[in-house]
C-alpha cells in the first residue's frame, strides 16, 4: 500500500529514482506507477504524458543547480559551475533531459541569471557575457555527454603513425571527471576573463 498520497512531487521523486538507478530509457509512466504502487491511469490526474514528466524532471533538476552568494565574480563562477557539474554527475540522465525542447524552465533562470551577472560583474559587456555563459554551458554538457576516456581496452595505437596519441595515452585513458572539468573550467575562464 502507498505510504504517501499521489502528487506531482511524489511522481517526480519516483521518476528521478528510476532515472538515477535504471536510466532514462527505463523511465515510463508504467514504471513510475509500479514504483508508486498505483495504476498508470492514476498518474494522468497529475501529469499529461511522458513528455510532461521529463519537463517536470528537468524543473526538479534545475532547482538543484547552485546559485552562489556574495563574493568575487570569478570565485562565484567557479563554485557555481563546479556545483552544476556535481549535480550532473549525480544524475547521468540530466544532459539528455536538458537537451529536450522543453528544457528552459522558470527554475533554470536563477542559475542563468547568477552566471551572467557574474560575467558582467567581471567586466564583460552584454554580448560577451552571453557568449561566455553559452561557452561554459557547452563545456559542462560536453564533458558530461563525452564521459568515456580515449583508450578503450583492446584498442591499439601504432606509435609510428600516432606519436602524440601514444605519448599522451596514459593521460587520455584515465579520466577524473571532477579534476578534468575543474581544469577545463579554469582554462576557459582564463581565456574569457584573463588569467587570475
Predicted regions span which residues?
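Basic, helix-initiating cap at the start of DNA-binding domains
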Residues: 1-38, 47-55, 179
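Residues in the recognition helix of alpha-helical DNA-binding motifs
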Residues: 46-47, 132
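Hydrophobic alpha-helical connector segments
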Residues: 66-108, 133-136
Amino acid at each position: 500500500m502507498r505510504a504517501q498520497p499521489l502528487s506531482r512531487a511524489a511522481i517526480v521523486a519516483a521518476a528521478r529514482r528510476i532515472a538515477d538507478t535504471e536510466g532514462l530509457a527505463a523511465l515510463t509512466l508504467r514504471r513510475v506507477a509500479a514504483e508508486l504502487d498505483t495504476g498508470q491511469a492514476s498518474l494522468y490526474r497529475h501529469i499529461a504524458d511522458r513528455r510532461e514528466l521529463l519537463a517536470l524532471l528537468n524543473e526538479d533538476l534545475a532547482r538543484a543547480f547552485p546559485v552562489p552568494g556574495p563574493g568575487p565574480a570569478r570565485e562565484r563562477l567557479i563554485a557555481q559551475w563546479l556545483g552544476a557539474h556535481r549535480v550532473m554527475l549525480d544524475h547521468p540522465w540530466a544532459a539528455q533531459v536538458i537537451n529536450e525542447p522543453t528544457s528552459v524552465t522558470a527554475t533554470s533562470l536563477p542559475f542563468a541569471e547568477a552566471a551572467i551577472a557574474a560575467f558582467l560583474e567581471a567586466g564583460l559587456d552584454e554580448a560577451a557575457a552571453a557568449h561566455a555563459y553559452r561557452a561554459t554551458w557547452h563545456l559542462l554538457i560536453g564533458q558530461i555527454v563525452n564521459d568515456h576516456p580515449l583508450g578503450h581496452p583492446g584498442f591499439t595505437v601504432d606509435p609510428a603513425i600516432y606519436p602524440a596519441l601514444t605519448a599522451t595515452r596514459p593521460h587520455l585513458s584515465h579520466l577524473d571527471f571532477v579534476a578534468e572539468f575543474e581544469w577545463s573550467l579554469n582554462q576557459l575562464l582564463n581565456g574569457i576573463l584573463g588569467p587570475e
